[in-house]
Design a protein with these regions (language model features):
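Conserved N-terminal diphosphate/IPP-binding helix and adjacent helical/loop segment
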Residues: 1-46
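Structural motif
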Residues: 20, 58-62, 120-124
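Short runs of predominantly hydrophobic/aromatic residues within well-ordered alpha helices
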Residues: 22, 26, 46, 63-68, ...
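Alpha-helical phosphate/pyrophosphate-handling elements in metalloenzyme active cores
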Residues: 35-66, 90-99
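A generic structural signal for short coil/turn motifs at secondary-structure boundaries
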Residues: 37-38, 77-81
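His-Asp-centered metal-binding catalytic motifs of divalent-metal-dependent phosphohydrolases/nucleases
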Residues: 49, 64-78, 87, 110-116
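Post-HEXXH active-site segment of zinc metalloproteases
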Residues: 82-92
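Histidine/acidic-rich helix-loop-helix segments that form or flank divalent-metal centers
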Residues: 101-126
Length: 126
């Protein structure tokens, strides 16, 4: 799994999302993670996390939710702000616009919020 457009489309088009809309969200995420002020939550971090996710596929309840949570988990990064909540809200908005199933959106939001210090790290384990 990587951050390429083809992989993103494979995940997001599975529920019938419009390709152009999927491409626009992907471009937004790539731009966010490529910003010059990114030192840790950048594209290399996302690619690394996606690679790790591929190694634990058999231990994950919903791999699509995990992939999406990885892509969105810290896409919004503002110093001194609740980045997990902001990123979860953004993911919810964008995935809803892409017509993702509500249950999937809720899992993605829960996974993103689990990255907050003190969050539930077992939210997607089998």
């Amino acid at each position: 799994m990587d951050t390429s457009l083809s992989v993103w489309l494979e995940v997001t088009e599975q529920w019938g999302a419009n390709t152009a809309d999927c491409v626009a969200v992907h471009k937004h995420l790539l731009t966010a993670y490529s910003a010059k002020n990114r030192y840790y939550h950048d594209l290399k971090h996302i690619e690394h996390m996606l690679a790790v996710a591929n190694q634990v596929v058999d231990q994950v309840q919903d791999i699509s939710a995990l992939y999406l949570a990885i892509w969105f988990h810290d896409c919004i990064q503002k110093i001194g702000r609740d980045n997990e909540q902001l990123s979860a809200d953004f993911a919810e908005d964008k995935l809803t616009e892409l017509k993702a199933p509500v249950a999937l959106v809720n899992r993605v939001v829960a996974l993103i919020m689990s990255t907050k210090h003190g969050g539930d790290s077992n939210v997607n384990r089998k």
